[in-house]
Regions:
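Histidine-anchored nucleotide/phosphate-binding helix
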Residues: 1-14, 141-144
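Well-ordered alpha-helical segments embedded in enzymatic catalytic cores
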Residues: 2-5, 112-116
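Conserved N-terminal ligand/cofactor-binding loop architecture of enzyme catalytic domains
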Residues: 9-112, 155
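Conserved nucleotide-sugar donor-interacting segment of glycosyltransferase catalytic cores
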Residues: 116-155
C-alpha cells in the first residue's frame, strides 16, 4: 500500500506525530486491516458518511453556508468528480447513465461529507494532507476543507 510506505518513510524522519485516514473503498480497507495494517488515529469511512448523507435533508441556506466556508461557488464538482455518486458504485466497470441517486440525496451526501471532514480536521489539526487525484467526493471535499483552513495538500 502506497500510503503505508509513505507513512513509514515519514515516521523514520520523525515528521509524523499522528495520522488520520479517509477511506473510500470498504473491501480494500477490510483487506488492508486483515493484512495487519495499523490504522492508528481517526478513520473516516466514506460508506458510513454517504449513508448518513443519503438520509439527510439539506436546505439551500445550509448548502450556501458550506460553499461560502469552503470558498467555492458550488459543491457540485465534488459530486461530479465521483462518478459513483451519480452513476452508482459499478460506474467504473459498466457504462450506464441511469441516475443512481436523487438530487436530494446528492445534496445530503455533499453536506454530510463536508461537515464530517471539517469536524475531523478540527480534531486532527493536520499540518499536511496526503492524497491522490481527488476522484471521490471525500477526496475532493478534503482538498477544499484543507485549502479553506490553510493546510498544505500533497497530491
Amino acid at each position: 500500500n502506497v500510503f503505508d510506505e509513505v507513512l513509514e518513510r515519514l515516521r523514520r524522519t520523525g515528521a509524523v506525530e499522528r495520522v488520520s485516514w479517509y477511506v473510500a473503498g470498504r473491501s480494500a480497507y477490510r483487506r488492508w486491516i486483515e493484512q495487519g495494517a495499523q490504522a492508528t488515529g481517526e478513520v473516516v469511512r466514506e460508506w458510513e458518511v454517504v449513508e448518513r448523507g443519503r438520509r439527510r435533508t439539506t436546505s439551500p441556506a445550509e448548502i450556501a453556508a458550506w460553499e461560502e466556508r469552503l470558498g467555492v461557488d458550488t459543491l457540485w464538482p465534488a459530486l461530479v468528480a465521483d462518478r459513483r455518486m451519480t452513476l452508482g458504485r459499478l460506474a467504473k466497470i459498466r457504462q450506464d447513465y441511469t441516475p443512481h441517486r436523487s438530487l436530494t440525496e446528492l445534496r445530503g451526501i455533499a453536506v454530510e461529507t463536508a461537515e464530517t471532514l471539517w469536524e475531523a480536521f478540527d480534531r486532527a489539526r493536520p499540518d499536511v494532507v496526503l492524497g491522490f487525484v481527488p476522484v471521490t467526493v471525500g477526496d475532493y471535499l478534503a482538498y477544499l476543507v484543507a485549502r479553506a483552513r490553510g493546510v498544505t495538500v500533497l497530491p
